[in-house]
Each structure stands twice: as C-alpha cells, then as structure tokens.
Swiss-Prot record:
Domain of life: Eukaryota
Higher taxonomy: Eukaryota, Metazoa, Chordata, Craniata, Vertebrata
Keywords recorded for this protein, A-Z: Electron transport, Membrane, Mitochondrion, NAD, Respiratory chain, Translocase, Transmembrane, Transmembrane helix, Transport, Ubiquinone
Protein name: NADH-ubiquinone oxidoreductase chain 4L
Enzyme class: translocase
EC number(s) per entry: 7.1.1.2
Species assigned in the record: Lycodon semicarinatus
Gene name of the record: MT-ND4L
Length: 96
C-alpha cells in the first residue's frame, strides 16, 4: 500500500513539473491538468476505501464529474482557439 501511495505522489509531482515546464501547446497543458485530476481521483478512492465514513463516499464521484466538465470546457477552448488562430501555441495567444 505504501508503494502505491508513493507512486501516486511521485506521479502527481512529475505532472506538476511537466505542467510548469510545458510552455508550447495548450493541449499538452490541458492533458497535464487532466492527469493531475485523475491522480487525485485515484487517491480519493484509495483513501476512502480505507476509512469507512459515509460522509466522504460521494466525494470521488463529485470530483470525477467536475473533472469531466473541466475537460469538456478545455477541449471546447482548444477547438475555438484552433479555429481562430490556426494553432494551439501558447506563445501566440494574447488573451488581453
């Protein structure tokens, strides 16, 4: 069990580092954020299975729902930006 926790923590930190180092494409940044959300979901499921409290049972489903909504919004933003600018390079975006 400790190896699984350490693997999830390490994967989460690697994803944060990849997100901070990634400065080129919007799609890659959104994939890093989605990976972080899936890791948090896995952690919630693992830690809630150890504690049998009823009040924390719906939390993984709520997190998964919010993550799916965020992914849908991110994908629609990528489509809109690609249609207007022709690519998804972050350096070409001037959001102001």
């Amino acid at each position: 069990m400790e190896l699984m926790k350490m693997t999830l923590y390490t994967t989460f930190m690697i994803t944060i580092i990849a997100l901070s180092l990634q400065q080129k494409h919007l799609m890659l940044a959104l994939m890093c954020v989605e990976t972080m959300m899936l890791i948090v979901f896995t952690m919630l499921v693992m830690f809630n299975s150890n504690s049998l409290t009823v009040s924390q049972t719906p939390m993984p489903i709520i997190l998964l729902t919010i993550s799916v909504c965020g992914a849908a919004v991110g994908l629609s933003l990528v489509v809109a930006i690609t249609r207007t600018h022709g690519n998804d390079f972050l350096k070409n975006l001037n959001l102001l």
